[in-house]
Regions:
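Conserved hydrophobic/aromatic beta-strand scaffold that supports enzyme active sites
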Residues: 10, 23, 91-93, 113
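Active-site segment of metal-dependent pyrophosphate-handling enzymes
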Residues: 60-100
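Short, charged/polar surface micro-motifs in flexible loops or helix N-caps
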Residues: 16-18, 29-31, 42, 71-75, ...
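N-terminal strand-loop-strand
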Residues: 1-36
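The catalytic Nudix box helix
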Residues: 36-69
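A general structural signal for short secondary-structure boundary/capping elements
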Residues: 54-58, 67-72, 134-144
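Nudix hydrolase/Nudix homology domain
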Residues: 29-34, 101-145
Length: 145
């Protein structure tokens, strides 16, 4: 059981036939880190409800979550007085079309749309790189059907 759980989405769209991923940069102590929109679950929310809400809050986008893609990463957080807190992040894969991105100023300093290779280079965490790679493979498989 995780001490802390967040849900979010690996969000993509197409620009001139090229798949682009939404990569966000945080604020404050997270300003140096790029990742995917996500946030803590609120009481009574499902994982998908949390993911949809967090994507909307952080990017202004209304997205559609794709069936069949759910990835979990778990790790321990080293916090003062609580060295073994377990953190769980749940990510879905989501698409948006024809919308303007609007960064939530209080939590997001920048949002960029990057192709797979550019996005991979901008992500710092190995877990995020793995999840992006799995999302790209999933989309490549599903478009070949």
């Amino acid at each position: 059981m995780a001490d802390e759980k967040s849900c979010g989405a690996i969000v993509y769209t197409y620009e001139e036939g090229v798949r682009k991923y939404v990569i966000i940069r945080g604020t404050g102590i997270y300003k140096e880190f790029c990742g995917f929109p996500k946030g803590h679950m609120e009481p009574g929310e499902t994982e998908t409800e949390t993911a949809l809400r967090e994507v909307k809050e952080e990017t202004g986008l209304d997205v559609t979550i794709l069936d069949g893609f759910r990835r979990v990463d778990e790790h321990f957080l080293a916090r003062e007085g609580r060295p073994n807190d377990k953190k769980m992040n749940v990510y879905f894969l989501a698409e948006y079309r024809d919308q303007e991105i609007k960064a939530q100023q209080s939590e997001v300093s920048e949002i960029v749309l990057l192709d797979y290779h550019e996005a991979l280079q901008n992500l710092q965490y190995e877990e995020s790189k793995r999840e992006l790679t799995e999302a790209e493979a999933y989309l490549c498989r599903s478009t070949k059907r």
